[in-house]
């Protein structure tokens, strides 16, 4: 097994993950559709489980999403054609409350393209800023 991903592949995976956090890209169904694997599942920070179709439907109509601050984005190879991305997001509400969420995504290499097959967000803390 390859010990690590090359820098170009890491950069591609990071770009793709960040694209899914970009408000304008999230509303572009074709763009998101191209990044989600057919069996994509998300466990949101609320604990709700989202299917691929539910995710596509939600993102197409999302109007209040603001891009969070992203920290500590790391990529690790799990096996041939399987990568894990981990990071944390910080999002500040209108009331000044900041939510820290730990996030992880599993990406698979499918017919030469990286696709996200799993994402989970877990709230790690809240504070007033």
Task: Briefly describe each language-model feature range.
Residues 2-34, 39-129:
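A beta-strand edge to alpha-helix "cap/lid" segment located at domain peripheries
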